[in-house]
Amino acid sequence: MSLAEIADVRLEGGGVMFQYLLLQLEWDAERRTIVRGLNYQPYVDKIEEQIVESAREELGENGFFEKGGDLQIGGGGSVAFNLYYENITLFGSNPTYGVEEDRDAVAKMIESAYPEHEVSWYGPEPLDSSSEPSDSNSKE
């Protein structure tokens, strides 16, 4: 088995909103980065654990871990996948693992996996303290 045989991007579960993680693989002095995501629903707990478990199962089927392979999580975020307009947008950060180091590289990976879609992204922006709602009910 070679790391090149593993798909770069896999978004599972259909739908339009996904939570994704960037997974860094190392095996036999070879390194590779892959993206794995699952359909995100606000009521689904521990989506990150489900993504990691799904990736571990996929890699385990190929004997990756038995042969000394290592998997590290390098952050993640959310994906809006619009099939009708054929566009994909990456945004936000993962609440457990934070944001990945190079979102542009992740966008290019997704663009290669879905060449018929326009891919865009923006990074997580810090909350601007000046945008806090004012207390319109206060009486002075």
Protein language model annotation of sequence segments:
Residues 1-140:
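Intrinsic low-complexity, intrinsically disordered or marginally ordered coil/linker segments
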